Amino acid sequence: MSGAEEAGGGGPAAGPAGAVPAGVGVGVGPGAAAGPAAAALGEAAGPGIPDEAGLAGARQLQEAAGDPDAPPKKRLRAAEAAEAAAAAVAAGSGKLEERLYSVLCCTVCLDLPKASVYQCTNGHLMCAGCFIHLLADARLKEEQATCPNCRCEISKSLCCRNLAVEKAVSELPSECGFCLRQFPRSLLERHQKEECQDRVTQCKYKRIGCPWHGPFHELTVHEAACAHPTKTGNELMEILDEMDQSHRKEMQLYNSIFSLLSFEKIGYTEVQFRPYRTDDFITRLYYETPRFTVLNQTWVLKARVNDSERNPNLSCKRTLSFQLLLKSKVTAPLECSFLLLKGPYDDVRISPVIYHFVFTNESNETDYVPLPIIDSVECNKLLAAKNINLRLFLFQIQK
């Protein structure tokens, strides 16, 4: 096995062998910097010599610390990291992984990426979460997203993944939060979930109400002494009733969906929300779909961010709400149930929620109702995309 293959073992898939050299060259544009991937090889300079890798990492952190647009906490963290990196370079000491930390960290959150790594045209690195967040913020502020280091334009088409850095980061050692032993980052998740003897686990009698949480190596002793298996039926009934309530709510939702699927008139279509701006002095972002036809009627969907609050880009919590509008005329009230789900080619996580409304010529639009996205991270994924693609189901209720 070659040295390059050994360095990449256990990391994320990097495609065919011919694709690796393209990932190693971090810069992708004219005048691009050598970048962190090349800097990772700076260990060849040997201990005691201030190699280019350490100097580049220290300079990068110093730039982040001096950025007037950066939040105070980030500037403080960057300053501390820059001092540590500069001291390590000056002394020519410290473990390789400690020196690589400042070189391979994300330029936004200053932490080592946990998954995909993106780079701007000048080679500055961003973890997937920060990259998506920058694009979402730019969409909310109606600005072009830029790299926080060099201010060059960034987008999904301009930026690319850096497979060399992803593989290098996956091989760096990381400490298990339970047993405090060190493992390659690519193996740490499996160790914490399946192998660590100190990982937090639950009693097998949790189904009958046992609340015990503890280290895995104590599980056998606890289960042997657990009092729940010896409880009477009456004692267990109260516990089981509470646990069944959440299950009943979930089953009620799915039973409602199955009931709707038995209706005579059902329609569904793929809808594409496109971003627009209001005509206000301070414009606000909103989304609207082109007109579409379902159940022989013409409809439009609209959506807004954080209920159209003034500065949603300043909020860490992001939500989307939507309304359904009937654009065609009806001769009688049109009673419908509807729900939005993810499209066939998207990976956004949306919980199904059924909404109900009676459409008339005088009342032809619903109130804004929440789009049941799992969390703000999923919302940022939608905002970062050029368009939002979902699937709408409409059920006409006939009396």
Swiss-Prot record:
Taxonomy-wise, where does this protein's organism fall, top ranks first? Eukaryota, Metazoa, Chordata, Craniata, Vertebrata
Q: Which GO terms describe its cellular component?
A: nucleus; perinuclear region of cytoplasm
Top-rank taxon: Eukaryota
- InterPro entries registered for this protein in UniProt: Sina-like_RING (IPR049548), ZFTRAF1 (IPR039338), Znf_RING (IPR001841), Znf_RING/FYVE/PHD (IPR013083), Znf_TRAF (IPR001293)
Localization, per the record, is: Cytoplasm; Cytoplasm, Perinuclear region
Annotated TRAF-type zinc fingers sit at 152-210
PROSITE patterns, alphabetized: ZF_RING_2, ZF_TRAF
Q: What protein does this entry describe?
A: Zinc finger TRAF-type-containing protein 1
Which GO terms fall under molecular function for this chain's record? zinc ion binding
What are the start-end ranges of the zinc fingers (RING-type)? 106-151
User: Is-annotated flag, keyword Heme?
Assistant: no
In this chain, the stretch annotated as Disordered covers: 1-20
Predominant subcellular localization, coarse grouping:
cytoplasm
Instruction: Name the UniProt key words of this record, in alphabetical order.
Output: Cytoplasm, Metal-binding, Zinc, Zinc-finger
Quaternary organization: Interacts with LGALS3.
State the similarity comment.
Belongs to the ZFTRAF1 family.
**Where is composition skewed (Gly residues) in this entry?**
1-13
